[in-house]
Amino acid sequence: MPRKLRDLPEEGEIVMATVERVEDHGAFVTLDEYPGVDGYIHISEVASGWVKNIRDYVKEGQKVVAKVIRVNPKRKYANLSLRKVTDHQRKEKLKEWKREQRAEKLLEMAAEELGKDLDEAYEEAGYKLIEEYGSLYDALERAAAEEGPEPLLKAGVPEEWAEKLAELAIENIEPGRVKIEAYVDLTCPAPNGVEIIREALEKIEEFQQGDVKMEVQYVGAPRYRITVDAPDYRTAEKMVRKAAQAAIDHVEEHGGEGEFHREIEEG
């Protein structure tokens, strides 16, 4: 089953669980993404309102989407709620789960071709991809979009894994729309510097056209975040750099300075 980087879930996290046993007062479950972690759903957390028969809502072997309300690290145990999960959260979690299952299958296929098992696959490649991109699927989708192993190599994955995973991703994953973020620093000492910077930001937004969406947000002087939503990574990367350069050119024409950052260091 798809795995997470952490050993335990966090409070408030939406998780996938399998119902192992149902009793009158609640249901005992295992957390699918966290091996060795058990959970409990009290009858009061099964549904809104009065629940006469808990078995009308959950059954042994059933997969459920739940919200973590408490975690006991020593016992590796979590208290969960079904009623606190919104319809949107449930839909998104199921979508994520199906994608991660698909991605893990590709990871397993790569492992078999390289003479490794799934545990080795996660240790040598999987966890690195999750850390870099948030999920296995997002990492493989990016490799499919860029038609090569570069995004996987960037995450520190060994070349043999990157090549094999990229090959499988290109064959099996149809890239969807992508969203990326980049940053631009803009300063202008001119008397009308604020107006110059405002015009520069408008230059960025002018690159929003057709199926490319562009958004600019103030982060903190002198930095602005540019978010691009595009059909594929190549388009997104191309447009964010063009837009940032247009803004930088504008402030430099008026005696200011600008600098583009594809990524920024945390902390």
UniProtKB/Swiss-Prot annotation:
SMART domains: S1
Keywords from the named record: Initiation factor, Protein biosynthesis, RNA-binding
Residue ranges of every copy of the S1 motif domain listed in the record: 12-83
Domain of life: Archaea
A Pfam family this chain is assigned to: S1
One term of GO molecular function: translation initiation factor activity
Record's signal peptide: none
Family assignment from sequence similarity: Belongs to the eIF-2-alpha family.
Subunit and partners: Heterotrimer composed of an alpha, a beta and a gamma chain.
Function: eIF-2 functions in the early steps of protein synthesis by forming a ternary complex with GTP and initiator tRNA.
Name of this chain's protein: Translation initiation factor 2 subunit alpha
Organism: Methanopyrus kandleri (strain AV19 / DSM 6324 / JCM 9639 / NBRC 100938)
